[in-house]
Amino acid sequence: MSKSTKKLYKENWSFSDIPDLTNKIMIVTGSNRGLGFFVAREIVIKGAHVIMAVRNIDEGEKSKDIILTDNPNAKIDVIKLDLADLHSITTFTNEFKEKFSRLDVLLNNAGITAGIKLTPHTPTVDGFEYFFGVNHLGTFALTGQLFDILKQTPNSRIVTVSSLSHKQGSINFDDLMSEKKYSNMRIYAQSKLANLLFGYELSRHIAQQKLNIKSVLVHPGFAISSKKKQGFWINLGKNY
């Protein structure tokens, strides 16, 4: 492992480092599988009340049942959320606010990876390019609609999962929806760069307004999620 790669890892970190989260209300988007599922599983062990925000309710309920098998007293709600549909985002936030009066952590985990093979120019429900629409615009809209309840909750936190792939990206304002030139990797990198810029600007706004919120950006490291099973690295490995 190279020195630069080693910097991406904290080798002695474990789930035991997660602090007590008793009674914390936490939304984890895309938590029916992959990284989001494992985050949800571990934070309920620490006492958090987790809202699994998922596109597929049936899959979400199955994942909830798996968690409850080992943690029967876990507090978990499953609510439908499709980041490719602005109406779904509004419906989700309205339902959440009807049930809860606080939000301690919003974990923006859900997204589309570069390994997913989409038909070029696949649109979201609202007509946006799919990668940019889900990874950035959907996350932006969700965070904005929950910002009022986050402001009301002391020491709340917004965690947005980005990627080091942002270094390969640029924001092409002349072709934001990639109508002229299409490349999965380029569009994915653009969406992750947009996540990064959004997180930075959100942090600046929070500091300027002197709000008791933190905006945190994370690169999850190298992980084999269910989405990456369809991706380049897994397919490459199958050939050897």
Specify the residue positions occupied by each region the protein language model found.
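Rossmann-fold NAD(P)H-dependent dehydrogenase/reductase core
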Residues: S4-G237
